[in-house]
Amino acid sequence: MKDRAADPVTKFSPSPYETGQFLRISERADVGTPQIDYLLATQRPDGLWGSVGFELVPTLGAVAGLSSRPEYADRAGVTDAVARACEKLWELALGEGGLPKLPDTVASEIIVPSLIDLLSEVLQRHRPAVGGKAGQEQEFPSPPGANAELWRQLSDRIARGQAIPKTAWHTLEAFHPLPKQFAATVTPAADGAVTCSPSSTAAWLSAVGTDAGASTRAYLDEAQSRYGGAIPMGSSMPYFEVLWVLNLVLKYFPDVPIPREIIEEIAAGFSDSGIGGGPGLPPDGDDTAYANLAGDKLGAPTHPEILMKFWAEDHFVSYPGEQTPSETVNAHALEYLNHLRMRRGITEFGAVEDACAEWVISQQTEDGCWYDKWNVSPYYSTAACVEALLDARKQDEPQLDSLRRAREWLLRHQTDSGGWGMAEPSPEETAYAVLALDLFASRGGEGAEECAAAISRAKEFFTDESRENPPLWMGKDLYTPFRIVDVTVMCGRAVVGRY
């Protein structure tokens, strides 16, 4: 908490997508070699970038960056990296079933068609011969889930200098180069960032030139220098980072003093519309729920009526009009309403609580877990849903059955190492599983002993501090929010230490 109070810069992992786009767009003299070094070092043996199942966005972004700098074309590795990536992309596109449906990462439906259009000539140069005949034109296909029409509509508005929804500012790199008339409709946050994205900010800066303020240049200086040139997926999301850390600390380390600067920072970011992930980002239901929850625990005014602005008939939304609702947004909102009822005696939201709990239960898989659009791991979303449902108002049979199935799913998926994970067990995912099982074990009843035994078996897994966490959080690319993950693992270790 002291580190966060002293250094509010968000600590997110670097991203091949963001680095590639930054390399393509930025006009800074020192952009080039550091970004290329990172991209060449992170290319997979098969020629792609990114995590399995999430390759298309980071690979297209990396190819866009590497192929945009002709002055580096003769450098060893660059031409080969582009060729290997394009050949693998064609292999996927022309293979049985074609390209898979896009994962629900942020704005992938806009980013992918923009990059396919941008890279049409590059992809065409590396198209394999079909039927033994080379040189035949064949467009690279658009994957299911891409929305080229939406990208074209937004592009047309931008070309005419018209404003676009603020939620689309996060991906201005998809419309580079931007007309100066349009750029005048975009206002960076006080810290200089355009909706927390270095590549989007670079696209805006390219359009406005010397009209940009010193804060924007300082923001890009920091983003560019943090990892030696590799660019983080998002930056300047301090509210999201601190709210997730703060709520974990308040639950599992309640004696740790909370710095006054952090409380003041959250209060300053909260408005009548709620709070977003950072300055310049629109308010969302997730951050608003967690800001209310932490604030009430710390004695600040609480505003359930503001959270209710994100209520949509039977569930809470992250943003109005979103394509895919979030299980964990609803879990966090329900956790806050549970807290108000149990700790403050506020019962006026009972109907909302019941409907929200029913919606969460309806999203559970047959296997017993939950998935979510903000974190690819089911352990993150299952832990959040378990915590919300255990304290929900109606403890009826559907709810009890849902919790039983979740408990059995967690117990069933512990590995011989004592850890949990989608692929290889990871400390982050093991922590989520342990925190959820601890909620069951600490309340007694059916399955409590089995949960306690599983937690005890996780002790050995946590003794190996060399284990790494894969990027699991979903932005434009998969990423790791280092502070949030570090504190999550600390909480998991603290719980295991009690068994």
From Swiss-Prot:
<dbReference type="GO" id="GO:0016872">
    <property type="term" value="F:intramolecular lyase activity"/>
</dbReference>
<dbReference type="GO" id="GO:0000287">
    <property type="term" value="F:magnesium ion binding"/>
</dbReference>
<dbReference type="GO" id="GO:0017000">
    <property type="term" value="P:antibiotic biosynthetic process"/>
</dbReference>
<comment type="subunit">
    <text>Monomer.</text>
</comment>
<keyword id="KW-0479">Metal-binding</keyword>
<comment type="pathway">
    <text>Antibiotic biosynthesis.</text>
</comment>
<dbReference type="InterPro" id="IPR008930">
    <property type="entry name" value="Terpenoid_cyclase/PrenylTrfase"/>
</dbReference>
<keyword id="KW-0460">Magnesium</keyword>
<dbReference type="InterPro" id="IPR050148">
    <property type="entry name" value="Terpene_synthase-like"/>
</dbReference>
<comment type="function">
    <text>Involved in the production of the isoprenoid antibiotic terpentecin. Converts geranylgeranyl diphosphate (GGDP) into terpentedienol diphosphate (TDP) by a protonation-initiated cyclization.</text>
</comment>
<keyword id="KW-0413">Isomerase</keyword>
<dbReference type="InterPro" id="IPR032696">
    <property type="entry name" value="SQ_cyclase_C"/>
</dbReference>
<keyword id="KW-0045">Antibiotic biosynthesis</keyword>
<feature type="short sequence motif" description="DXDD motif">
    <location>
        <begin position="284"/>
        <end position="287"/>
    </location>
</feature>
<dbReference type="Pfam" id="PF13243">
    <property type="entry name" value="SQHop_cyclase_C"/>
</dbReference>
<dbReference type="GO" id="GO:0016102">
    <property type="term" value="P:diterpenoid biosynthetic process"/>
</dbReference>
<feature type="binding site">
    <location>
        <position position="284"/>
    </location>
    <ligand>
        <name>Mg(2+)</name>
    </ligand>
</feature>
<protein>
    <recommendedName>
        <fullName>Terpentedienyl-diphosphate synthase</fullName>
        <ecNumber>5.5.1.15</ecNumber>
    </recommendedName>
</protein>
<feature type="binding site">
    <location>
        <position position="286"/>
    </location>
    <ligand>
        <name>Mg(2+)</name>
    </ligand>
</feature>
<comment type="similarity">
    <text>Belongs to the terpene synthase family.</text>
</comment>
<dbReference type="GO" id="GO:0010333">
    <property type="term" value="F:terpene synthase activity"/>
</dbReference>
